[in-house]
UniProtKB/Swiss-Prot annotation:
Disulfide bonds join 29-88, 39-69, 47-85, 67-87. Belongs to the DEFL family. Residues 1-23 form the signal peptide. Keywords: Antimicrobial, Disulfide bond, Fungicide, Plant defense, Secreted, Signal. It is found in: Secreted. It comes from the Eukaryota. The lineage of its organism: Eukaryota, Viridiplantae, Streptophyta, Embryophyta, Tracheophyta. The keyword Disulfide bond applies. This is Defensin-like protein 241. It comes from Arabidopsis thaliana (Mouse-ear cress). InterPro entries: SCRL. One of its GO terms (biological process) is defense response to fungus.
Amino acid sequence: MRYTTSFIVFCFLIFLQTNLVKGRTIRICDRKVEGNGTCGPNSNNICLDEFWKNPPSPRLAKSLEGCTCEPRGKRPKFKGLSHVCWCCWSYNSSNPAG
């Protein structure tokens, strides 16, 4: 048990040191993509496919963390069921979007 605890503490210290050297990581979830259809069981793949069709910038695509799908129901703009995807990415506070 003593060696397990030491290993866990050692890993935590490495994690802490890495974050102190690199700076604080900032996570942003404001990339909104709308589309036709419902979210369904493969909603993350639907959102990622829509994101990759039109990424905001090549640098941002490197730090993409994932997307979440929200059903929006029937809306006149889409002439049927629709959904909205919110995509998140992260960057280091000392080096934005890189």
